[in-house]
């Protein structure tokens, strides 16, 4: 099948990425409605943070790819703040890991199937075990994320499983590229890139304490806990510069 067409929710353009101006509650209802309608298409959800937006501004193919998603939601306070600076305020930040957990709650109630694709074999196994304890009504299957985009062996395995959800934790851009490369081989499936969420569910990484999340500085905690992320922090000032430049351009156009 194919990806559900872009939703009819209001859109907010952040440096060319078309975000849906929605809330977590609305997204949960959208996912429930998708299954209730028994669509044979797939629901492709992108959770984009400033780093993803930055990457998209310099990689046209990736920008075009994610703009084909059914929904693009703001996973990052930086995106929400940018929308306010551009006078197109997004309603809420929707963290990818929390949206994934909401999907799992729906899957648990409906006795659905979930495929976890990503991370190392050890980590994804641990994530599946932990999630199975939390959501016993879900049928899980998994595979590690160290595969080529064109690897059809894994795709065949997933097709045989017939999942209702495929959560891809390979990091961007690979996870979104994998989804769009293979989505036409599935039907009636929610597909979402979830970055490092599998590591968090596995217990390999800790999510930021509540106070960091409340203050919208979860990214600082992640950088402090994982030195490999330090180099990625440079994307924040670059993103801020691009937003400031876009704001000046809007002012000049008036």
Swiss-Prot record:
It holds the Pfam family Glyco_tran_WecG. GO terms for biological process: cell wall organization; teichoic acid biosynthetic process. Its EC number is 2.4.1.187. It comes from the Bacteria. InterPro entries: TAB_Glycosyltransferase, TagA_TarA, WecG_TagA_CpsF. Pathway: Cell wall biogenesis; poly(ribitol phosphate) teichoic acid biosynthesis. The keyword Transferase applies. Keywords: Cell wall biogenesis/degradation, Glycosyltransferase, Teichoic acid biosynthesis, Transferase. Transmembrane segments: none annotated. GO terms for molecular function: N-acetylglucosaminyldiphosphoundecaprenol N-acetyl-beta-D-mannosaminyltransferase activity. It catalyses: UDP-N-acetyl-alpha-D-mannosamine + N-acetyl-alpha-D-glucosaminyl-di-trans,octa-cis-undecaprenyl diphosphate = N-acetyl-beta-D-mannosaminyl-(1->4)-N-acetyl-alpha-D-glucosaminyl di-trans,octa-cis-undecaprenyl diphosphate + UDP + H(+). The keyword Signal does not apply. NCBIfam families: UDPacetylman_taseTarA, wecG_tagA_cpsF. Catalyzes the conversion of GlcNAc-PP-undecaprenol into ManNAc-GlcNAc-PP-undecaprenol, the first committed lipid intermediate in the de novo synthesis of teichoic acid. Belongs to the glycosyltransferase 26 family. TagA/TarA subfamily. This is N-acetylglucosaminyldiphosphoundecaprenol N-acetyl-beta-D-mannosaminyltransferase. It comes from Staphylococcus aureus (strain MW2).
């Amino acid at each position: 099948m194919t990806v559900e067409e872009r939703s009819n929710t209001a859109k907010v353009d952040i440096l060319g990425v078309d975000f849906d101006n929605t809330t977590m509650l609305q997204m949960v209802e959208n996912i429930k409605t998708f299954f209730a309608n028994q669509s044979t298409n797939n629901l492709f959800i992108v959770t984009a943070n400033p780093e993803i937006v930055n990457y998209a501004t310099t990689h046209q193919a990736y920008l075009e790819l994610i703009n084909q998603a059914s929904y693009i939601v703001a996973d990052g306070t930086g995106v929400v703040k940018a929308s306010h600076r551009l006078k197109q305020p997004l309603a809420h930040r929707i963290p990818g890991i929390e949206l994934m957990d909401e999907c799992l709650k729906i899957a648990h109630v409906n006795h659905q199937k979930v495929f976890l694709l990503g991370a190392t074999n050890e980590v994804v196994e641990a994530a599946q075990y932990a999630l199975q304890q939390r959501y016993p009504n879900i049928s899980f299957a998994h595979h590690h994320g160290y595969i080529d985009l064109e690897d059809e062996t894994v795709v065949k395995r997933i097709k045989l499983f017939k999942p209702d959800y495929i959560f891809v934790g390979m990091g961007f851009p690979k996870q979104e590229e994998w989804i769009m490369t293979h989505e036409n081989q599935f039907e009636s499936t929610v597909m979402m890139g979830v970055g490092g969420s599998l590591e968090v569910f596995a217990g390999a990484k800790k999510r930021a304490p509540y106070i960091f999340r409340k203050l919208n500085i979860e990214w600082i905690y992640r950088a402090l806990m994982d030195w490999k992320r330090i180099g990625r922090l440079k994307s924040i000032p670059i993103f801020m510069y691009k937003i400031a430049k876009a704001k000046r351009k809007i002012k000049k156009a008036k």
